[in-house]
């Protein structure tokens, strides 16, 4: 365990997380920004910036490693995160800080399921998981207009944080036309194949997705800036780990652990926002009376209860919120919340693995749905439909807090190559043309953010 870290408090009324990130991350190989918008209107109270790395925990091509050594694993590889974090754990004594004061931030790709269940999944060019303990952590408190720098040497960052920000426009940037991994007719055919599996009783539902690839000279952070304006969401993230970048604006929790409480929040059922209050309420009533949407939502709530039942004490799993409407900037969703009290021998990693991947990006029953996804989708999912989030340092009882979002409404980069992807839930009466269009509808904000990012980076926005 490390020593106590220094905390420096500054007034932040002239700074934003975006401008601060651009100042302090310049030239850094490792950096992240985590932000939140609550229910489409107000920014969440805290934003987090991580700079540099104390160490990394990477699982790639079956090899688990840190910055300087390869690690053995006997059970699932992610179980190593607790002992690894213990090495870098530090104490921070400050009453004004939120519960997350340090730990590991990163992403887990969809193909990690191969190490949890007996499902073979295509590996991608991205690591199966990648976590970083940052050298410096900057926390914004938007309510009190304060910023806290947690570091061995916070004075080093202070001058960068308080320095004027100079943005240099770059007009000669390009983005190639995104190319799909499906022809339209080919997608229709795989929807029909999925429906056949449903009729034969293999599954109730499966989520089939369409991926697009493109090349660009855009700085991915400008895409993040555009996306956070166009599609603000409860989970907004930008992770730069070397030449790997994962960024997004996700509406959906994958799983969360705070103390002994584990929570999942299934989202299923969507309508656009109305142009007037009356139209908005009419769309809400229409959504809550849509039998197909309700049936799909109830199935995913049951799946969440079953997942938590594997790691929570008997009789403690309950539905805390049932089918409430949550409104975001462009859409409204039906949302439920399921929680339970952790068994004494289970921790945050157990919760993560019990709920991964979310039923909303796989289907039900989950394992058979993922086998069918593997058969019908032509390319690996990579980080898409995985998770982004953090594990906090273990406390004195060895408990880690964890918060993770499903990696949807997101971009993934390896150098100048970019990917984006979206899925549609296929059920017995799905219409292939509508499901194809749903994948495009979900990507609309992402395509738009590519256009806006070019204007921002070119100084035209």
Swiss-Prot record:
Pathway stated in the Swiss-Prot or TrEMBL entry: Amino-acid biosynthesis; L-tryptophan biosynthesis; L-tryptophan from chorismate: step 1/5
Any GO MF annotation of the entry: anthranilate synthase activity
Residues engaged in binding chorismate: 269-270, 384, 409, 423-425
Record comment: activity regulation: Feedback inhibited by tryptophan.
Entry keyword set: Amino-acid biosynthesis, Aromatic amino acid biosynthesis, Lyase, Magnesium, Metal-binding, Tryptophan biosynthesis
Cofactor(s) needed for function: Mg(2+)
Residues given in the record as L-tryptophan binding sites: 36, 234-236
Residue numbers binding Mg(2+): 296, 438
Pfam families linked to this entry: Anth_synt_I_N (PF04715), Chorismate_bind (PF00425)
InterPro entries: ADC_synthase (IPR005801), Anth_synth_I-like (IPR019999), Anth_synth_I_N (IPR006805), Chorismate_C (IPR015890)
Gene3D superfamilies in alphabetical order: Anthranilate synthase
PANTHER family documented for this protein: AMINOBENZOATE/ANTHRANILATE SYNTHASE (PTHR11236), ISOCHORISMATE SYNTHASE MENF (PTHR11236:SF48)
Protein family membership: Belongs to the anthranilate synthase component I family.
Protein name: Anthranilate synthase component 1
Origin species: Thermotoga maritima (strain ATCC 43589 / DSM 3109 / JCM 10099 / NBRC 100826 / MSB8)
């Amino acid at each position: 365990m490390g020593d106590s870290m220094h905390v420096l408090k500054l007034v932040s009324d002239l700074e934003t997380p975006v401008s601060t990130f651009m100042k302090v991350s310049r030239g850094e190989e490792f950096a992240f920004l985590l932000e939140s918008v609550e229910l489409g209107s107000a920014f969440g109270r805290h934003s987090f910036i991580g700079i540099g790395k104390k160490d990394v925990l990477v699982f790639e091509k079956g090899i688990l490693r840190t910055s300087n050594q390869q690690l053995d694993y006997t059970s699932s590889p992610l179980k190593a995160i607790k002992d690894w974090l213990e090495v870098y754990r530090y104490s921070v004594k400050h009453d004004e800080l939120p519960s997350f004061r340090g730990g590991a931030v990163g992403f887990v790709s969809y193909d990690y399921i191969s190490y949890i269940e007996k499902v073979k999944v295509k590996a991608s060019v991205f690591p199966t998981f990648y976590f970083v303990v940052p050298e410096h952590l900057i926390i914004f408190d938007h309510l009190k207009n304060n910023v806290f720098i947690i570091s061995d040497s916070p004075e080093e960052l202070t001058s960068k944080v308080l320095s004027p920000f100079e943005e240099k426009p770059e007009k000669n940037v390009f983005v190639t036309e995104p190319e799909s991994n499906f022809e339209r007719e080919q997608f229709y055919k795989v929807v029909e194949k999925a429906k056949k599996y449903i009729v034969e009783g293999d599954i109730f539902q499966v989520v089939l997705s369409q991926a697009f690839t493109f090349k660009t000279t855009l700085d991915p952070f400008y895409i993040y800036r555009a996306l956070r304006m166009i599609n603000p969401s409860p989970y907004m993230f930008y992770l730069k780990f070397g030449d790997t970048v994962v960024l997004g604006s996700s509406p959906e929790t994958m799983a969360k652990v705070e103390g002994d409480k584990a929570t999942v929040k299934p989202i299923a059922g969507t309508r656009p926002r109305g142009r007037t209050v009356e139209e908005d309420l009419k769309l809400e009533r229409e959504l809550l009376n849509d039998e197909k949407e309700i049936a799909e939502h109830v199935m995913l709530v049951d799946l969440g209860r079953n997942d938590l039942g594997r790691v929570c004490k008997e009789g403690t799993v309950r539905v805390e919120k049932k089918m409430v409407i949550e409104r975001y900037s462009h859409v409204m969703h039906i949302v439920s919340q399921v929680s339970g009290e952790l068994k004494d021998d289970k921790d945050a990693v157990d919760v993560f693995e019990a709920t991964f991947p979310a039923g909303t990006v796989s289907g039900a029953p989950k394992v058979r749905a993922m086998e069918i996804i593997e058969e019908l989708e032509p390319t690996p999912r990579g980080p898409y439909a995985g998770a982004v989030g953090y594990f906090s340092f273990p406390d004195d009882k060895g408990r880690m807090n964890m918060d993770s979002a499903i990696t949807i409404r997101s971009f993934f980069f390896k150098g100048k190559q970019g990917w984006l992807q979206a899925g549609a839930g296929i059920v017995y009466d799905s219409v292939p043309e509508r499901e194809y269009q749903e994948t495009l509808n979900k990507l609309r904000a992402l395509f738009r953010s590519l256009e806006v990012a070019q204007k921002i980076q070119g100084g035209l926005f």
